[in-house]
Amino acid sequence: MSRIPTPQTIDDAPTASRPLLEAVKRQFGVVPNMFRLVSNSPVALEGYLGLFNSLSKGELPAATRERIALAVSEINGCSYCLSAHTYLGKKLAKLDDPEITANRNGASNDPKADAAVRFAVVLAKARGHVSEAELRALKAAGYSDAQAIEIVMHVALNTWTNYINEMAQTEIDFPVIKARTAA
């Protein structure tokens, strides 16, 4: 049970959050608990959705974004986000079980994606303090400056969702995947 009350329906959410939750429902077909939880703060929900939707139009493929989410969620010990991104990774990004395991371990079986995931892991663990060599390795794998910045933003976005879900102990509404690590 969540430590912060989660509106059970869109109509239970604050008035300013309702159109945002309706948009989530149109996009996903359902409104996952995390979105309903965050709707307690309409400005937080608006900010999250703005960044989420902007990044979805970026240069990184959806599969790479899901790989990063899995790696960061494992680092931060967020079972809610691991559950959500395992589900989304399989259903939307078509990631298989060996790939998801590799992502949770901070790697990828795809050579180019591996560079992005490893860079994201360094960013998350070192709180942004990456070496010149680590940035060069990312670029050598074919990533642009814009994509490097997007990777930073995905790490930040996923860290935020990890923190909010761990703080609130959001009830998991996906097939449950337990984090191996606790932050």
Predicted regions and their residues:
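Hydrophobic alpha-helical segments
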Residues: 1-183
